[in-house]
Amino acid sequence: MYVSVAVMDTGIFRHMDFDTRIAGFADFVGRKKYLYDDNGHGTHVAGIIAGSGKGSNGKYRGIAPDTFLVSVKVLDKSGNNLCYPLKWYIWHLR
């Protein structure tokens, strides 16, 4: 069974702790098609959730290290947010 968590934040940088477990990406700020994080906060949150510990030789792991991530960029580099992505997410839960 696979579990995915949507990280609705500033985006996610590729990182050795979860790079192979990024299941999707949507950018509602810059409309870019590639994975990025222009602030770093979203990547930090992703590590807390799903970090495998690979980058720290097992010293630092997330609370669910086998979880897949879906990066939903809803915050710009200054942390400002948008309402539309939340409506999109709720619509797709149906």
Task: Specify the residue positions occupied by each region the protein language model found.
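Subtilisin-like serine protease catalytic core
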Residues: 1-24, 32-84
